[in-house]
Amino acid sequence: MAQADMVRISVCYARPDSVFLKEFDVLQGTTIAAAIVSSGVQQVCPEIDPSTMRVGIYGKLKTPDTVVRTGDRVEIYRALTADPKLARRRRVQKTRESGTREGQKWLRGGA
């Protein structure tokens, strides 16, 4: 197998407490799904279910059948643990309760 038939990629999965990142070579024409299996991430992070988790390349959502290219970073995305709107409301409320000028800027009649 010639070196020209290989592409260098990395697979990344972030847990709240650690990050899996592996850089390796795969055959040209390898899909994202095959790259994930080849990386061994499922042995290190058994909670990964490729059939339900979203995947992407450098922050752009892709389908598992997308073919990887040299230099791609395949990312496996976890489900959100908190509603982003609710989390933002809590942060704003906490800032407002602190009594700082920053916390008052969005209130009517605020500074």
Curated annotation (Swiss-Prot):
A Pfam family: Ub-RnfH
Composition bias type Basic and acidic residues, residue spans: 94-105
Superkingdom field: Bacteria
Annotated spans, Disordered: 88-111
Homology family: Belongs to the UPF0125 (RnfH) family.
Protein name from the UniProt record: Protein RnfH
